[in-house]
UniProtKB/Swiss-Prot annotation:
Name under which the protein is recorded: Myocyte-specific enhancer factor 2D
GO molecular function, one term: protein homodimerization activity
Pfam families: HJURP_C, SRF-TF
Gene Ontology cellular component list: cytoplasm; nucleus
Domain MADS-box: 3-57
Positions of region (Disordered): 174-207, 244-267, 357-392, 423-507
Composition bias, Polar residues: 180-192
DNA-binding region(s) in UniProt: 58-86
Top-level taxon of the source organism: Eukaryota
Subcellular location: Nucleus
PTM annotation (Phosphoserine): residues: 98, 106, 110, 121, 180, 190, 231, 251, 430
GO terms under biological process: adult heart development; apoptotic process; cell differentiation; chondrocyte differentiation; endochondral ossification; nervous system development; osteoblast differentiation; positive regulation of DNA-templated transcription
Signal sequence interval, chain numbering: none
Amino acid sequence: MGRKKIQIQRITDERNRQVTFTKRKFGLMKKAYELSVLCDCEIALIIFNHSNKLFQYASTDMDKVLLKYTEYNEPHESRTNADIIETLRKKGFNGCDSPEPDGEDSLEQSPLLEDKYRRASEELDGLFRRYGSSVPAPNFAMPVTVPVSNQSSMQFSNPSSSLVTPSLVTSSLTDPRLLSPQQPALQRNSVSPGLPQRPASAGAMLGRDLNSANGACPNPVGNGYVSARASPGLLPVANGNGLNKVIPAKSPPPPTHNTQLGAPSRKPDLRVITSQGGKGLMHHLNNAQRLGVSQSTHSLTTPVVSVATPSLLSQGLPFSSMPTAYNTDYQLPSAELSSLPAFSSPAGLALGNVTAWQQPQQPQQPQPPQPPQSQPQPPQPQPQQPPQQQPHLVPVSLSNLIPGSPLPHVGAALTVTTHPHISIKSEPVSPSRERSPAPPPPAVFPAARPEPGEGLSSPAGGSYETGDRDDGRGDFGPTLGLLRPAPEPEAEGSAVKRMRLDTWTLK
């Protein structure tokens, strides 16, 4: 970009004239300095402005230069304005146009120099247009979370298909030439049993693989439970590749079945995933209602689930809110739970009401239920049991526990494999504070294998269940079976257990 061209004529504006004088005076003195240094000469510059104000410049001493000037009588070159204008016209320059110098540089700019600069600028522009597109863009990876709603219901017919309604699809906006580690993706299910996926964060989407069957990865949580703190809406529970169940927070679920078990050779995983999206889950319920039960004869081998999440009470879910001082990493080593008829009833298999008595070496015969008015009996001594075996608290959660859902296959039984020196008992709970029908007395059965036709009915509510939910209709009972062990290592006698049962019942 060249300098601004001005006409070489008197400037009428006082302010512009003063500015131009200051700039060009400094430029003239700068040129005189350069000339005196470069060419080893003496220069004396005397300037009077339009108001007769003196400005002078001397390379050495003004008096000495003026003395030499007055005493010099040799012929010399002397020029005026007319001589300069004539010289410029001979060289092809227009004497009427001159570039406006700045305060730092008063170098005269010729048209040849301008053409040179213009050609250089055009060449640079051509290079940018030619090679600008091949400049590699900066490589970056940006995880983008996109909610996806799958309208197809064919995914539930494949055992290895994952739940994507609603799901979080994590894509990376990255350069194809970039080989950077991808961010951990938020996925619903783990398709590979040996490589379970882990969630990237614990914000709006909490997911964890409770994969105790293959032992590929340990449980990262110390007490073994998955928090559901960011789930004000629905809580889907997924077992294995497709064993999915959706539990609404404050209303009874519709009579739907979405039971999809993996292959028999693969032990299914039990996963608890919470999400804040509710529309996609309602669409998932509609798809599951049309599908029905496809494969319900497979067995759930080793589920691991926790019922000690404190924030589930505020959601109104029928889970037990036991303190986390207990061992909450519960396992059911071999529980063939596929189709119990008692699971289909609304009040079947409630929390903490299944009483299983097992002596150290032999199972005890079934006993009739004790009335609440019976007197406590004195305790009887019983052989102590080794304290090194830690019993486990076993809650069982299946997708066919949804109330009001019929089961096509009946005949499987509940098998609880325990150590021969472990006594498993169940502590009863107080009567329900919700609107529910009159509860029948709890049934007592041995821990070996009950008959398929026997139902495990109990009251629909409990002391570990919240009683101030918004919708407490009686047809929505708990859907977890809970086997509670003795907290102390020394076992008690049957009379002491009956006394404790009566004491809890009277409360």
